[in-house]
Swiss-Prot record:
Belongs to the Maf family. GO terms for biological process: nucleotide metabolic process. CDD domains: Maf. This is Nucleoside triphosphate pyrophosphatase. It comes from Ehrlichia canis (strain Jake). InterPro entries: ITPase-like_fam (IPR029001), Maf-like (IPR003697). The keyword Cell inner membrane does not apply. PANTHER family: BIFUNCTIONAL DTTP/UTP PYROPHOSPHATASE/METHYLTRANSFERASE PROTEIN-RELATED, BIFUNCTIONAL DTTP_UTP PYROPHOSPHATASE_METHYLTRANSFERASE PROTEIN-RELATED. It is found in: Cytoplasm. Nucleoside triphosphate pyrophosphatase. May have a dual role in cell division arrest and in preventing the incorporation of modified nucleotides into cellular nucleic acids.
Amino acid sequence: MLKFDNLILASSSKQRLSLLEQIGVVPGEIISPDIDEVILKKELPKAYSIRIAQAKCEKVKLLHPDKFVLSADTVVCCGRRILPKVETEEQALECIRLISGRRHRVYTTVCLYTPHGKLHCRNVVTVVKFKNLSVQEIDAYIDSRQWYGKSGACSIQTNAGKFVLSINGSYSSIIGLPLYETYSILNRYFSI
């Protein structure tokens, strides 16, 4: 694994850091950008994911204009409805009931700002289908609290993975960072 001192990961996500390490990249610094993640009226999931990932990148870039800044944002949606990053059992229950037995989409955008002011962004959409969950399965998942802080209450890399019937797209993108797209962007500037 290589540590890139001039690369900042603009994220507090442990999953994103772990995924970066899978492609042999360790950022020199990790900064959690504090941005407003409010959903705009009539904003579609893909546009929201792109806007938030860019905002994270731009916030950190203002503080460190001479560094590369990598950011990402993951959004879970059912239809056009963007599901929240859940913080309460009530929110988690609502989201899990909504996606039970249905397909939902996961949009992840990865962005890289260069020291030269160039912005690279890639958006990946993955379709996930959950089995029809019983009341007992929903209750057990809610009790596990593995949904906390996750978009749409989904944590398929942990306990919720057993509910997935199919994935059409990028598994790593669902967890928070599309590896192929991230590698492709970083490989333009770093030897990985």
